[in-house]
Amino acid sequence: MNTVKPESIALFCLTPGGVRLAKRLAAMLPLTCYTSEALQEEGFIPFNGGFASAAREVFSSFSALIFIGATGIAVRVLAPLVNDKLSDPAVVVIDERARHVISLLSGHAGGANALTRYLAGMLDADPVITTATDVNELAALDTLAFQLNARMTDFRAAVKTVNQMLVSGKRVGLWCDGEFTGALSRCDRRGFIPVSDLARLPALDALICVTLRRSLPPLPVPHWKLVPQRVVAGIGCRRDTPCALLSTLLDRQLAAQRLDPLALKAIGSVSLKANEPGLRQLAHRCRVPFETFSAEALREHEHRFPASSFVRETVGVGSVSGPVAWLLSQGNLSGETLREQGVTITLGVTH
């Protein structure tokens, strides 16, 4: 899943007019600008082996690519590189007179539609966006998911089904747990029908539920959970603890707090465990970052948790999982620490 960040945008220009427009844009937002050797100026990187070669080289390295020139040229160059709308970068094309800004690739998931609107506003140009939900002035489920940094089971199929329902005029409800009311109010919800009480649903064809809950009560309509990634897990373990055991215990701890595994945002441990195979494999399996903290950083918070002299002698701090979860969640812990088979797991929920 790709999210456009202003500091990770590459821009390609092929003509003198394109260079002038690139300099205009570079004065307003951070860009890495590429052009031919013949047109190179200060602040521009020359193509390495030509335009197509340079584009291929950076395609997976930036969150977004801007091409100043003909759409057809961009299509021909990028066609062999396109892989998946959930991971490909946003691609936007601008004509060198800055009359039109075109969202070409990864409109929702990559953020190309949002970038197109932003650039068009800066340039007083016409944004050209062709995704069905946008042209019908509706929100899209994949956009909502990325705005909330949320996951779903079978995300691709859910997005296809729900977006088609929205475009077809079906009644798709949108409900959230109270803790997400503020975040949801800042999201694009056009076309969704607000739902405040799961026990008193209006007439609906489908329902989206924004929640961290592991399970929901029985509902009379087709529904999908949209699960924001908010849960963090501090983990302490003995050397060479198998990933399978860590995974089983983590799932048990999440279940004890009635939290959906999709809500996991990060796992962490002490720096001494930075290369612990089981922990690294667990992070990879859960598709989350593995973050580590120095013993010194953890000692600042170990007074909040029961300490072990053995752990202190081994890693330099009397408690690992609690202080790690405290740091990852800014002190917003959830439930009791699991202690089993040489493993400790403490959960927290980020804001």
Give short role names for the model-derived ranges:
Residues 33-57, 276-277, 301-307:
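N-terminal beta-loop-helix "entrance" segment that forms/cooperates
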